[in-house]
């Protein structure tokens, strides 16, 4: 591994992201594409940038990210979690600030499974009295 490179793994729903951080000019590369190319939705881009904006390091670090599985919001959440972990490896003093914003905790919510006899996880078929 190259020196002064920091790593963090992030997970959310069924997505997993590997994030590598090194000092640079603020370039973000996700699966060999830029942030703007990879995420069409502005909300997803905002979620990815949140931890960097919180600690004022948007222009100071280069990010190389690989992400697999899930959909757009799951991948954005996984990347945010990975960036947070990599930032804590980079500078441990950022931990309290990131924890206060709620980025350190892994969101453990998963899709509830569909049950037999129901239409979805909890949606029951319509009830008819007669």
UniProtKB/Swiss-Prot annotation:
* One Pfam family it belongs to: Ribosomal_S9
GO molecular function terms listed in the Swiss-Prot or TrEMBL record: RNA binding; structural constituent of ribosome
Where is composition skewed (Basic residues) in this entry? Answer: 116-130
Q: Which Gene3D superfamilies match?
A: 3.30.230.10
> A GO term (biological process) for this protein?
translation
GO cellular component terms, alphabetically, are: cytosolic small ribosomal subunit
Annotated segments matching region Disordered:
111-130
The protein's matches in PROSITE patterns, at most eight in alphabetical order, are given as: RIBOSOMAL_S9 (PS00360)
Task: Write out the entry's keywords from A to Z.
Answer: Ribonucleoprotein, Ribosomal protein
Which PANTHER family does the entry mention? RIBOSOMAL PROTEIN S9, SMALL RIBOSOMAL SUBUNIT PROTEIN US9M
Q: Which family does it belong to?
A: Belongs to the universal ribosomal protein uS9 family.
Q: What is this protein called?
A: Small ribosomal subunit protein uS9
- Species of origin: Enterobacter sp. (strain 638)
